[in-house]
């Protein structure tokens, strides 16, 4: 059964406090947030402050400082922020921390304040009313979030243009709901897959950027340092060296304007 989307963001779920401790037992203290001023972004934690944003342990969650920086730059208080691949709700939590209105959609809603909606068919009543859209879409069939056949992440990157065509529809919907002068941001990485002893590189970022340019004016391109634990695991690094391929050390953050 499909939840009915509406324009009243529901109350903020209670978020657990941070308990992260580095080796040695000393409590890790997250540094204060600040506006990133170069095109290389880095922050040593998934979350900021003393609490958590989104659901702890959710696979593929967006680092919350990225959304914080975007909303500080491109939105004002009371403006409407939408995330149509809302995942664990990180965008919703950050937006509410900053006194922005927020709506989250996903075909696999993980919280009650996220509505079960396909990003290719956003609610018609949103047309021209959204100030900012953030998306961190699934790609490459790396993660399985559920059985909904509308899940774009189930489209294989190696299977022609199906994934990119689906994302093109998403970009068209984002263009429809954004107000003139509104901004969107896409957070994504390229992909390298092993198939039957062979490797396949997929330039996901460039492919999606080319599609977005049909609808939007580019503002800037950011490289975001990845802090995935596997990047430091010896077996992963050894396999990359012996297999003559590269581990993904950064994500793209494409910022565009309607």
Where do the language-model regions lie?
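Class I S-adenosyl-L-methionine-dependent methyltransferase catalytic core
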Residues: 1-258
């Amino acid at each position: 059964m499909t939840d009915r989307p509406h324009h009243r963001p529901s109350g903020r779920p209670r978020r657990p406090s941070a308990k992260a401790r580095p080796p040695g037992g000393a409590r890790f203290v997250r540094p204060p947030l600040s506006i990133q001023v170069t095109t290389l972004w880095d922050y040593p934690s998934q979350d900021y402050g003393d609490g958590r944003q989104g659901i702890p342990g959710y696979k593929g969650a967006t680092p919350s400082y990225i959304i914080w920086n975007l909303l500080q730059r491109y939105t004002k208080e009371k403006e409407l922020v939408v995330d149509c691949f809302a995942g664990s709700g990180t965008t919703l939590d950050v937006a509410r921390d900053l006194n922005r209105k927020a709506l989250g959609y996903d075909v696999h809603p993980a919280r009650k304040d996220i509505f079960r909606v396909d990003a290719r068919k956003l609610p018609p009543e949103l047309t021209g009313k959204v100030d900012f859209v953030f998306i961190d879409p699934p790609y490459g069939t790396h993660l399985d979030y559920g059985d909904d056949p509308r899940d774009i992440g189930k489209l294989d990157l190696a299977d022609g243009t199906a994934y990119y065509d689906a994302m093109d529809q998403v970009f068209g919907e984002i263009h429809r709901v954004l107000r003139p002068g509104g901004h969107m941001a896409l957070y994504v990485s390229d992909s390298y897959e092993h198939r039957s002893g062979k490797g396949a590189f997929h330039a996901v970022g460039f492919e999606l950027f080319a599609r977005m340019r049909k609808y939007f004016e580019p503002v800037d391109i950011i490289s975001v340092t990845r802090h995935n634990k596997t990047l430091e695991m010896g077996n992963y690094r050894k396999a990359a060296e012996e297999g003559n391929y590269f581990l993904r050390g950064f994500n793209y953050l494409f910022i565009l304007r309607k």
